[in-house]
Design a protein with these regions (language model features):
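Structural signature of the two symmetry-related core transmembrane helices
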Residues: 96-109, 298-312, 391
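Helix-loop-helix hairpin linking two adjacent transmembrane segments in secondary transporters
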Residues: 119, 148, 157-204
Length: 410
């Protein structure tokens, strides 16, 4: 018996050695590579958000039309997430990520020279679809290749690359647009992205634990329908849709409001306002800790209420109130989103990766629909219209959270 236990331990140790462990050179290379991939993806994805007021003037389009430069990109990303995850099961993780990240980075350079807004939108649609090949596969790669005890650190580093990239892209574009032009900003970011692509392809270790599987559409469809029949999961998907819709709406049209009288803020300052995203890094972690103590539905409810309070604080004219409101709004959003996404994985009883993909699909679909629809309210009613629309989405979210609280035992 002792011999068998010893052999079992030796076998387990050998298996752990096969996986990438924290503290090894391979771990550092893999994590820096995926950090770079996450940074590139979200820096380029949201690159047009601070530029919406510029697009309305340069291309002579409405704010709603300008917002499509982001909404259509996240829409194609949403559909791409459902496709690339399945394709990678057959074609491999690193291959698809490498192809997608190079194509998407090159497209940023092409977008910079778009002679018309229609062409810009077409390129952004293709770019969003290409970038879907990163988030849908990166976590699967980490789960397969990283040793279990090191996985939490690896996931955290990858997600930090996402958030820092999204923040850096917005700040960089706002600053370079003021100093030179938005075209120069895109050329700079596109060039940085291509350099990072080369590093990613060199540094990311090849998959050792990936097992190719033939595409089987029927089991995927059965699993999909099973998730969509679960009332708790459907409610969580809808919460993702409405929360992200409200979040993108506020940040899409905040720039328009702050370039108008009595504020007249520059693109640089508007770009730096996105630094409030940093409070989301804290709230997402803190809410996760509190969720274990007080329950996940209650924390999602708390985050949504904070978003409502934040939106209401943006209504007074003094910019101080608007900035405090945006901080509270952002704090609540990231807290609620982190707990809701975790509850999806916790509640799903099978095919957890697919359930998470459906959550992300709803999340980015909300970004597309909410961001574009919010433009109609901005054009018709100004900032009060944007806040009214956002409050409506958040009230629906509150009702859905109460439904989850009633149905879920979490």
């Amino acid at each position: 018996v002792n011999l068998m236990i010893t052999m079992s331990k030796d076998k387990q140790a050998a298996m752990n050695k096969e996986h990438i462990q924290q503290g090894t050179p391979a771990f550092k290379k893999a994590n820096f590579a995926l950090f770079a991939a996450g940074f590139i993806t979200f820096a380029n994805l949201y690159i047009t958000q601070p530029l919406l007021p510029i697009f309305t003037k340069e291309f002579h389009v409405t704010p709603t039309m300008a917002s499509l430069s982001l909404s259509l990109t996240t829409l194609s990303l949403a559909f791409g997430l459902l496709i690339f995850g399945s394709l990678s099961e057959a074609w491999g993780r690193k291959n698809i990520m490498s192809i997608c990240i190079v194509i998407a980075s090159l497209l940023t350079l092409v977008v910079a020279f778009s002679p018309s807004f229609k062409l810009l939108l077409m390129l952004r649609i293709i770019q969003g679809f290409a970038f879907a090949g990163i988030p849908s596969i990166a976590m699967a790669y980490l789960g397969e290749e990283i040793e279990g005890r090191s996985l939490g650190v690896a996931m955290g580093l990858y997600i930090s690359g996402n958030s820092i990239g999204g923040l850096a892209g917005r700040v960089l574009m706002g600053t370079i647009t003021d100093l030179v032009s938005w075209t120069a900003g895109m050329i700079l970011l596109g060039s940085i992205s291509l350099i990072a692509c080369v590093y990613f392809m060199w540094a990311l270790p090849p998959s050792k634990h990936f097992v190719s599987q033939p595409l089987a559409l029927r089991p995927l469809f059965r699993s999909l329908m099973s998730h969509l029949k679960d009332p708790v999961l459907v409610s969580l998907f809808l919460i993702a849709f409405f929360l992200m819709g409200s979040f993108v709406t506020v940040f899409n049209y905040l720039g328009f409001k702050l370039t108008e009288p009595p504020y007249y803020l520059s693109m640089t300052i508007i770009g730096w306002i996105f630094l409030v995203y940093l409070v989301g890094t804290f709230s997402s972690t803190w809410f996760g800790i509190l969720a274990d103590r007080y329950g996940r539905p209650l924390l999602i409810l708390t985050g949504t209420v904070l978003m409502l309070c934040g939106v209401l604080l943006t209504l007074p004219i003094p910019i101080f109130y608007k900035l405090i409101g945006i901080v509270i709004f952002t704090f609540g959003f990231f807290g609620a989103h982190s707990v809701a996404s975790g509850l999806v994985s916790r509640h799903a009883t099978h095919d957890i990766a697919q359930a998470s993909s459906l959550y992300l699909f709803a999340y980015y679909l909300g970004s597309s629909v909410g961001g574009a629809t919010g433009g109609v309210f901005w054009s018709l009613f100004g900032w009060s219209g944007v806040t009214s629309f956002t409050i409506g989405l958040l009230i629906i979210s509150l009702l859905l959270v109460l439904r989850v609280k009633k149905l879920s035992k979490a």
